[in-house]
Amino acid sequence: MNDSQDTNQDPASLYQLGERYNKGEGVSQDHQEAFKLFKISAEQGYSEAQSSLGIMYAEGIGVKKNYIEAIKWFISSAKQKNSSGEYYLGTMYASGFGVDENLQEAIKWYKLSGGEGNIKAQYELGEAYLKGKGVLQDYEEAVKWYLLAANEGDMKSQAKLGYIY
């Protein structure tokens, strides 16, 4: 596929093709090609591609690690209520990568993501409430979030519930 064809394609199709290259499904794994496809799709406003592009920048997959670019793409994705973008934006605030560490801001994004069913965010909220990180310690609230994730098969949340009880 050449660049002129890439830019004229549907952003969802570009994203799906990028996922195939990223995972090596039906094609040889090629992170740089995945990055290129995600970027074209993301620039067209496709929130899943924006989140995936943010992950690639944050982890240095197919591109040089760049937390500032990662944050930019996570914000673009999160503004469209993409639960993955919200989760990863929360993670950046929790870790202080690319932004000042801000646990309250991380919790805000985790709640948005977790409320939309993101299991990773639900687990992180369970952890936050269990340990009192960024929120007041609240075992009932911790159990609530762990249960949401555990009911979707999250083994870490299931283990935490076993620990609590």
PLM region spans:
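Short helix-capping/linker turns of helical repeat alpha-solenoids
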Residues: 8-10, 23-25, 30, 43-46, ...
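Hydrophobic face of amphipathic alpha-helices that form TPR/SEL1-like repeat modules
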Residues: 14-23, 27, 37, 52-59, ...
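TPR-adjacent "capping" and linker segments in tetratricopeptide-repeat scaffold/adaptor proteins
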Residues: 1-12
